[in-house]
Curated annotation (Swiss-Prot):
GO cellular component: small ribosomal subunit
Region of interest called Disordered, as start-end residue ranges on this chain: 1-26, 67-91
Keyword Transport: no
Domain of life: Bacteria
InterPro entries, alphabetized: Ribosomal_bS20, Ribosomal_bS20_sf
Transmembrane segments: none
Name of protein: Small ribosomal subunit protein bS20
Length: 91
């Protein structure tokens, strides 16, 4: 990349740092979401796992890693998945 100006170079460095932070946060969200769904199947620590996943999603939305609507959608889908697993276990 031909970044000739100091400010452009700095913004590029900042964008790379921000990208890595965002990728890390999104990866963590995916990991804890999967753990919450897995906890629903085993039945242990479900409330804590779901709470942790939703907390991470909210923090990502607050810090502009995720859009607020995307965060709401992820939380909704997480709750649906957990409820689906619970219903399957009861029947």
């Amino acid at each position: 990349m031909a970044l000739r100006h100091k400010s452009a170079q700095k913004r590029h460095r900042q964008s790379l740092k921000r990208r890595m932070l965002n990728r890390s946060r999104k990866s963590t969200i995916k990991t804890f979401t999967k753990q919450a769904v897995a906890a629903a199947t085993t039945g242990e620590n479900l409330a804590a796992a779901q709470s942790k996943a939703e907390s991470l999603i909210d923090k990502a939305a607050k810090g502009s890693t995720l859009h607020k609507n995307a965060a709401a959608r992820k939380k909704s889908r997480l709750a649906k998945a957990i409820n689906r697993v619970k219903a399957a276990q009861q029947s």
